[in-house]
Each structure stands twice: as C-alpha cells, then as structure tokens.
Amino acid sequence: MAIARFPSLVIDCPDAAELARFYGTMLDWKITVSPNWAEIRADYGDCICFQQVEDYTPPQWPGQQVPQQTHLDVNVDDLDAAEAAVLELGATKHEHQPGTSFRVFLDPAGHPFCLCVD
C-alpha cells in the first residue's frame, strides 16, 4: 500500500495567476486563482499549483548558475502545431535544442519545459 498519493506539484514563480493561465490553457485544465496562489486541475484529478514568490529568480538552463530544480515534459501529437500554440501563449523557444523528438521552451516565468512526441 502506498504511503501517499500524488495530489499536486507546486512551482514557484513571480506571478501565480499568469503561470496558471499559461499551463491551464496549454493543458486545457480548470484554473483556480487566489492571492499568491493558483492551481490547475485536470478533470481526472491531477493538479499543478503555482506559488507566488517575492524576489523570484528564474532557472538558467542548461547552465547551473541558477539550476532548474524541476521541469515538465508534456506529450503532443504534432511538435510544429504545439510549438506555435505555446509560443502564442507566451512561451519562448530555448536556443539549446538537444534532441529531435522533443523541443525545449521556457514558460513565462523562465522554467524550462519540453514538448515531446513518442
């Protein structure tokens, strides 16, 4: 029997509502916003939370001066279509692209994330 369940992942950021809108729109999950906190939730229950942090410093990937501590990989059917959609939402395509079956982007708070195909 499991000791715990995986209820949510919490990501620090400078603007919780903005980052929730970015990922909520990308994943088509329900967005809930409160002061300094926001979350997105899938219909099947998975949740990602966003915690507003003063003096937030974005990670610098692939360097390690300010290392990433986590990043999201999301699966897509069409890399080109998904790239256009996340760029329109406010993502930035990272200059370092180390693979061919995925693409690396930065969310509006500077966290790396990948769009991946099988």
What name fits each language-model region?
Residues 64-86:
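Mid-chain, well-packed structural core segment of small domains
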Residues 55-61:
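A short, acidic/glycine-rich surface segment
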Residues 115-118:
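Short hydrophobic/aromatic patches at helix-to-coil boundaries
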Residues 107:
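Short, acidic, Ser/Thr-enriched surface-loop or helix-capping motifs
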Residues 2-3, 7-53, 81-104:
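Core segments of cupin and vicinal oxygen chelate
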Residues 39-40, 61-64:
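Short secondary-structure boundary/capping segments
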